[in-house]
């Protein structure tokens, strides 16, 4: 459901970017530590040119950096759509406070506003014409009612949880592996955060969809 809603937002953003000379649409999506929403939304619409996720660091400046790649895209096609997960690019900030929210998560700096200002400053300094629109849908993408597929899946999770509890099982969550519902120990589930495998099929599919460089680092 979340990336279906994000898909509609990206589609509208693409229309906005395409309607202006050297138009840039910059969309920030949820994803504190993993870029799954951004990656899946991009694959669903196939209109995004750059995806920035927490799993992969990038440089802003220099011939191999993001701004140079964005400028090249605009010179060739005169519009660009950029999707950034909220946890991407945190290493670009000069100071990190380490402050935590009520849930104990480290508060990230706002990469969306940061990129918006850096893009504007760089292209203005170069005298390069552009039009930039920044979109932050925030919680909109996860506050929508679940679609039919997600509703069905959640009902099946609940049914399996009740069956397991009635059988005397405890300290578990319901998983889904190889088209089978499974019982996973809570300790195993929370031991490690799930992240995109940047050498795996999902990320390579994203690279093929966007056409962005494999790396946006200068070295």
Task: Describe the residue ranges of each PLM region.
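Accessory alpha-helical/coil subdomains and C-terminal extensions
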Residues: 1-24, 28-130
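C-terminal non-catalytic interaction/assembly regions of soluble proteins
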Residues: 99-219
């Amino acid at each position: 459901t979340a990336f279906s809603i994000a898909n509609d937002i990206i589609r509208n953003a693409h229309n906005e970017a395409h309607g202006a000379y050297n138009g840039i649409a910059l969309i920030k999506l949820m994803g504190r530590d993993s870029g799954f929403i951004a990656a899946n939304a991009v694959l669903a619409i196939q209109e995004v040119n750059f995806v920035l996720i927490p799993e992969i660091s990038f440089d802003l400046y220099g011939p191999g950096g993001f701004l140079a790649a964005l400028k090249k895209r605009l010179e060739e096609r005169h519009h660009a759509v950029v999707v950034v997960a909220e946890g991407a690019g945190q290493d670009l900030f000069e100071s990190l406070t380490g402050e935590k929210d009520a849930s104990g998560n480290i508060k990230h700096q706002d990469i969306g506003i940061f990129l918006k200002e850096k893009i504007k400053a760089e292209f203005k300094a170069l005298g390069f014409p552009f039009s930039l629109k920044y979109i932050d849908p925030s919680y909109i993408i996860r506050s929508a009612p679940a679609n039919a597929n997600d509703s069905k899946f959640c009902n099946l999770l609940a049914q399996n949880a009740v069956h397991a509890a009635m059988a005397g099982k405890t300290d578990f969550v319901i998983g889904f592996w190889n088209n089978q519902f499974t019982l996973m120990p809570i300790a195993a589930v929370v031991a490690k955060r799930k992240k995109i495998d940047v050498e795996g099929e999902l990320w390579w599919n994203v690279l093929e969809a966007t056409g962005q460089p494999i790396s946006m680092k200068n070295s």
